[in-house]
From Swiss-Prot:
Coiled-coil intervals: none
Matches recorded under NCBIfam families: rpmD_bact
Protein name: Large ribosomal subunit protein uL30
Any one GO MF annotation of this record: structural constituent of ribosome
Keywords: Ribonucleoprotein, Ribosomal protein
Gene: rpmD
Taxonomic superkingdom: Bacteria
Subunit composition and interactions: Part of the 50S ribosomal subunit.
InterPro entries: Ribo_uL30_ferredoxin-like_sf, Ribosomal_uL30_bac-type, Ribosomal_uL30_CS, Ribosomal_uL30_ferredoxin-like
Biological process per Gene Ontology, one example term: translation
Keyword Ribosomal protein listed: yes
One Pfam family recorded for the sequence: Ribosomal_L30
Amino acid sequence: MTTPKNVQVSEKTLEITQIKSTIGGKQNQRDTLRSLGLKRIGHTVVRKADAVTVGMINTIPHLVKVEEAK
């Protein structure tokens, strides 16, 4: 497992899983999760590790778990 703050831009594919709720969170954090395609706790999406995705992950590291896709 990679900690969200250690994610680097690369050609790799990432599995991003929401692990915490957005209740009580800021609107920009909810918007970031929605932009990544995450809708609920335990939901996982697969994205390329480009600059946009890594930037979004870095704004919400406490809400997601990031792993390299197999």
